[in-house]
A protein has these predicted regions:
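Conserved C-terminal beta-signal and adjacent last beta-strands/turns
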Residues: 759-777, 792-922
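Signature of Gram-negative outer-membrane beta-barrel scaffolds
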Residues: 514-618, 788
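Membrane-proximal, glycine/serine-rich, low-complexity loop/turn segments characteristic
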Residues: 17, 29, 56-58, 79, ...
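Structural motif
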Residues: 21-33
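Outer membrane beta-barrel strand-and-loop segments of large Gram-negative receptors
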Residues: 364, 498-500, 544-550, 648, ...
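Short, acidic Ser/Thr/Gly-rich low-complexity loop/linker segments typical of extracellular
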Residues: 43-58
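A short, solvent-exposed loop/turn motif at the edges and junctions
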Residues: 40-46, 68-83
């Protein structure tokens, strides 16, 4: 490990260079922010460096010594300055730009500006950052300063997750970032527009807080007004593995259409169950910021999710289509469909230690899943002018999921241990239909009206079966004991109808302040039915019909509220105080028992933003929330949560209260290419719903209860990334601490969890040399419980290296290696490695690409994870796919039609949806 640390800290590339720096102004001496300074190597004719002037007009450019460069200084609306220079020492040179009559795009320039700043939009030229090894959009984005793609495929800009991805101003699969980053070919990307302060609605842009909202708009490379592009990839290898992946895109001014297909058994699911449930289709909770939260449960069937999209075997199929059609009168019709099928084989072993009784349970699970997931969305938007916008959306989400598990469980103390074999099955076919209507209207310069409504129709129908040798709940359930095994089945049906509507009125007092009045209603109706039965050896069914085992519940929740918010900007400060008055009515009916609660509440909120510069801010947010549960925690008859866990709800649960403080700092320096992100969060929940558990051995019976003990959590994070001409480095740290109490066997159980994550990386960024990234991640997880004085600590160290290189004439080599060292405070639990490599060849000018890839070169077998809850800590080891070799061939489908955009006088670029103006506080 010491050698690894030395390598991480040892400089990789050192060469002599000097800088040219100075100040850029107009002829009157006013500083110009956002001017580009680019340097083209006169010998190679390659863009070799660029800089951007900061808010004071200063720029800095580092260049190789004794090399002649052509320097060009440009800014929109000003005549460029151009000259040749060769450096052997640092020099200072200032520039005074003159305004020009013609637009910049009418002036012939050899190289496009790498970065252009237009108000709240930053435009990156892809070619200025590409190194030649990029295959997909994710690879392009990773080269750009301030943009990251995380392990989940989400895009982060300036530390914030991007809400939406558009292509040529049109939503791509409703803006889903993972589908875009993994499927859009890199060679099609011309420019990347980062849309700051993004909002779906133009009219509300200036009266709502959008500082954390970012979107990306991808401009395609070719200048034609209509064309096809895409690629078809096919691959195979030993053991009859396969990959087939067609991607076809058609774009024109008023119509676009996309088809993405994928079929593979190489462990690369294009869309997992987790992604499927994350895919909201653009629907947001209308009451999310009103001070009320009601958690409508989904995916209650207990189907397992993959760990980091890795398993013993994964077979995936995907077919996705997306379209958009519009006219010049403000009408746009769009939609998408997604079908995904995954067959997963999961094999894992779990060691679980219970805090209360020090019993250790060792389980082995062999799981076979078959998940078919479907999504369909249709949208109509009408925006005839700048004062009116209408929108209707409908989203259908349905799936067919089943899971069969062979489970072995061995538990006890010392030599007194029990062994049991279980056969567990789960089936569910949930669906949801979500509809949304929006209307926005601006009346004059002072008044804005908006009306939004949503309706959710959802049903879940999980069925669970368990065949086991031992009855773990002898005194609770009257099973027939004269059978060779206990064959138990449970059915549940939960129907939900949720209606939300709110009306907003905005009054613009002046350029610095406005008032917002909101009237809204949230209405939830749920029905819940569950029962279970025993199947005898003969096939006869024994139903448990007692009310203790059968749930039949009707639940209603209504929140009527009125809110007043005030927004004012003075100097560097923006204040957003608000207050919301709520009237709540909740009731549930279970057989002859009726429970009703009527309450009212006042919930304040406050947001203070300090905008030191356009790219530097500090923000404090305070919010109080009343938190309600849904019907799942209210149903008082027994249900099985798992093979060793029974659950009973509490019909008289009360709402909890959550207080949240959030502090965030952000600094983006385009002059030095240094970004700093930091934040802190504190959350306190009182009267929250916690569990009261009776634990016998490893078997448990849980009931929810309103806890008199607060639940507190703290988090801190920080990240610093820095770029120079050919190097980029990043340091990150994150702390998470939580403390909560539950009742276990009538005793208070206090649980503390502390997580620490550290990361550091250094990467080169050459255009004409191989690039390498080295990094190191260090994670510590500590779990404490008041029942057990032993502190459970798990450590993970992960050094890694990535290499990508373009060489010869058309060869691209990519490789990634990581080593994971996993231990607790007493012993090493596992060490495992990931090493993948890929070599491809594409002849210049050819549409064909050939490649060979090897995954899991070292053929490691398993991965470890750890976690904890109020009852136990556990470490989990699961098998992953073995080494495989894949031979691939790819064909480029790009074809053109129509005229060049510049030749069509009536053509215009599609403006990004939702970011086309609107008033704003000055």
């Amino acid at each position: 490990m010491k050698k690894i640390l030395i390598i991480l800290l040892f400089p990789i590339f050192v060469y002599s260079q000097s800088s040219i720096s100075g100040k850029i102004t107009d002829v009157d001496g006013n500083s110009i922010m956002g001017a580009n300074v680019i340097a083209v190597n006169n010998e190679t004719n390659v863009l070799d460096g660029f800089g951007i002037s900061n808010e004071n007009g200063f720029y800095n450019l580092n260049l190789k010594n004794e090399t002649e460069f052509n320097i060009k200084v440009t800014f929109i609306g000003f005549s460029p300055v151009e000259f040749n220079i060769s450096l052997n020492q640092d020099i200072i040179r200032n520039f005074a730009l003159e305004e020009q009559a013609e637009a910049l795009d009418e002036v012939e320039i050899v190289y496009e500006m790498p970065v252009t700043i237009k108000g709240d939009t930053i435009v990156y030229s892809a070619d200025a950052f590409n190194t030649g090894t990029e295959k997909k959009l994710a690879d392009v984005l990773k080269n750009m300063p301030g943009i990251e793609v995380n392990d989940d495929g989400e895009i982060e800009v300036e530390g914030q997750v991007v809400r939406k991805v558009q292509i040529e101003g049109k939503d791509f699969f409703d803006g889903d970032s993972k589908l875009a980053t993994q499927n859009l070919p890199a060679k099609a990307v011309g420019k990347v527009e980062v849309l700051r302060n993004f909002t779906e609605n133009n009219q509300l842009r200036g009266v709502t807080n959008n500082e954390d909202n970012f979107a990306l708009n991808i401009r395609l490379k070719d200048g034609q007004d209509k064309f096809w592009f895409g690629e078809i990839t096919a691959g195979t290898g030993p053991d009859d593995i396969h990959l087939i992946s067609p991607k076809v895109f058609y774009y024109s001014k008023n119509f676009n259409f996309s088809v993405i297909g994928n079929s593979n058994d190489i462990g690369q699911p294009p869309l997992s169950r987790r992604d499927f449930y994350r895919f909201g289709g653009g629907f947001n909770n209308l009451n999310a910021r009103t001070g009320t939260s009601i958690n409508i449960s989904s995916d209650v069937g207990g189907i397992s999710s993959l760990q980091n999209n890795r398993a013993k075997s994964i077979e995936s199929e995907l077919l996705a289509t997306n379209f958009s059609v519009s006219n010049d009168k403000g009408l746009e019709i769009s939609g998408f469909s997604i079908f995904s099928s995954n067959v997963n084989e999961i094999e894992e072993s779990i060691t679980r230690t219970y805090f209360t009784n020090n019993i250790t349970e060792e389980t082995g699970r062999n799981v076979l899943q078959n998940n078919e997931l479907e999504l369909y969305k249709f949208s109509v938007e009408y925006e005839p002018n700048d004062i009116l916008q209408l929108e209707y959306n409908i989203l259908l989400n349905q799936s067919n999921q089943n899971e069969n598990t062979d489970l072995t469980s061995m538990y006890g103390r010392g030599s007194n241990r029990t062994n049991e074999l279980l056969d567990i099955g789960r089936i569910q076919t949930p669906y949801s239909l979500n509809q949304e209507l929006k209307m926005y209207y601006t009346a004059g310069e002072k008044n804005i009206f908006s009306l939004e409504a949503q309706h959710l129709d959802q049903e879940e129908d999980p069925i669970g079966t368990s065949i086991r040798e031992i009855n773990p709940f002898l005194n609770l359930i009257d099973f027939d004991t004269n059978q060779t095994s206990y064959n138990t089945s449970q059915t549940r049906n939960i129907k939900t109808k949720k209606f939300e509507t709110k009306f907003d009125y905005y009054y613009l007092i002046n350029d610095q302040s406005n008032i917002n009045i909101t009237l809204g209603v949230t209405d939830v109706k749920q029905s819940y039915f569950s029962n279970f039965f025993q199947t005898f050896d003969s096939g006869q069914i024994k139903n448990f019909s007692d009310q203790l085992y059968v749930n039949d519940v009707d639940f209603n929740f209504t929140d009527s509220y009125i809110a007043l918010k005030y927004r004012i900007k003075t100097g560097i400060f923006t204040f957003d105080p608000g207050i919301t008055l709520h009237s709540y009515n909740t009731n549930n009916n279970q057989y002859s028992d009726y429970f009703e609660t009527k309450t009212s509440d006042i919930r304040p909120d406050l947001r203070i933003n300090l905008q030191f510069k356009k790219t530097e801010s500090l923000r404090l947010t305070y919010r109080e929330t009343t938190q309600f549960t849904d019907v799942n925690n209210l149903a008082k008859a027994y249900v099985f949560n798992s093979y060793n866990s029974l659950f009973r709800g509490e019909p008289e649960l009360e709402a909890g209260k959550v207080i949240n403080y959030d502090l965030n700092y952000r600094s983006i320096n385009q002059f030095t290419f240094t970004n700093v992100f930091a934040g802190a969060n504190y959350s306190k929940r009182s009267n929250s719903i916690q569990s009261r558990t009776t634990l016998v051995g490893v078997n448990q019976v849980r009931r929810p209860t309103n806890s008199s003990f607060p639940v507190e959590s703290y988090s801190l994070y920080g990240r610093l990334d820095k770029r120079t001409k050919n190097l980029k480095g990043e340091i990150g740290v994150r702390y998470n601490f939580s403390e909560y109490n539950n009742i276990v066997n009538d005793q208070v159980s206090k649980t503390e969890n502390l997580g620490q994550n550290y990361s550091v990386s250094l990467a080169t960024n050459f255009r004409d040399k191989p690039n390498i990234e080295i990094g190191y991640r260090y994670n510590i997880n500590k779990y404490n419980n008041s029942f057990n004085s032993v502190e459970n600590i798990f450590y993970r160290e992960t050094p890694y290296v990535r290499v990508d290189a373009y060489f010869g004439k058309g060869f691209v080599f990519n490789s990634e290696y990581s080593y994971n060292y996993y231990k607790n405070q007493n012993e090493v639990l596992n060490d495992f490695r990931f090493w993948d490599a890929d070599l491809s060849y594409e002849k210049e000018g050819s549409k064909w690409e050939y490649s060979i890839g090897v995954t899991n070169i070292l053929n490691d077998q398993s991965i470890n994870r750890d976690s904890a809850n109020d009852l136990s800590s556990q470490t989990r080891m699961y098998l992953i796919q073995p080494r495989y070799i894949l031979f691939k061939v790819k064909y480029d489908l790009t074809a053109f039609g129509g005229s060049k955009k510049s030749e069509d006088k009536n053509s215009s670029e599609a403006k990004p949806r939702g970011n086309r103006g609107g008033g704003k506080l000055k």
